[in-house]
Amino acid sequence: MAKKIIGYIKLQIPAGKANPSPPVGPALGQRGLNIMEFCKAFNAATQGMEPGLPIPVVITAFADKSFTFVMKTPPASILLKKAAGLQKGSSNPLTNKVGKLTRAQLEEIAKTKDPDLTAADLDAAVRTIAGSARSMGLDVEGVV
């Protein structure tokens, strides 16, 4: 028989830097989960990733105080800013362009994001990422 699920917790935690302080501690503490056990497991799972890269994670809490977690891919906006070498996007994306990305860079980001995108193929995924880039004030080359 499957364990009874008491809730889901969605967080964005920097890779390799999970610790009991907010937001992790209070979110897990409310459900009575072992905070340090999660922190150790998350940090071990993100060990090979770039330190500090925000990783979305969905934690499933069970009635017996156990948990499982699923890591998603980093947000597209973070990957786009990193590829363009920016600190933040444009405050007015229609008139104030802050950077430029090529199709090759967008394809690389689309391949990274592929498990979380619902796109039918790589070209559709690239167009999705290109739309995110445009909304951040980035010029996109080679994508219609």
UniProtKB/Swiss-Prot annotation:
Similarity section: Belongs to the universal ribosomal protein uL11 family.
Keyword line: Methylation, Ribonucleoprotein, Ribosomal protein, RNA-binding, rRNA-binding
InterPro entries in UniProt: Ribosomal_uL11 (IPR000911), Ribosomal_uL11_bac-typ (IPR006519), Ribosomal_uL11_C (IPR020783), Ribosomal_uL11_C_sf (IPR036769), Ribosomal_uL11_CS (IPR020785), Ribosomal_uL11_N (IPR020784), Ribosomal_uL11_N_sf (IPR036796)
Gene designation: rplK
Molecular functions per Gene Ontology: large ribosomal subunit rRNA binding; structural constituent of ribosome
Record note on modification: One or more lysine residues are methylated.
Species for this entry: Neisseria meningitidis serogroup B (strain ATCC BAA-335 / MC58)
Pfam family, one: Ribosomal_L11
Entry GO CC: cytosolic large ribosomal subunit
Subunit structure: Part of the ribosomal stalk of the 50S ribosomal subunit. Interacts with L10 and the large rRNA to form the base of the stalk. L10 forms an elongated spine to which L12 dimers bind in a sequential fashion forming a multimeric L10(L12)X complex.
Descriptive protein name: Large ribosomal subunit protein uL11
GO biological process, one term: translation
Keyword Transmembrane helix assigned: no
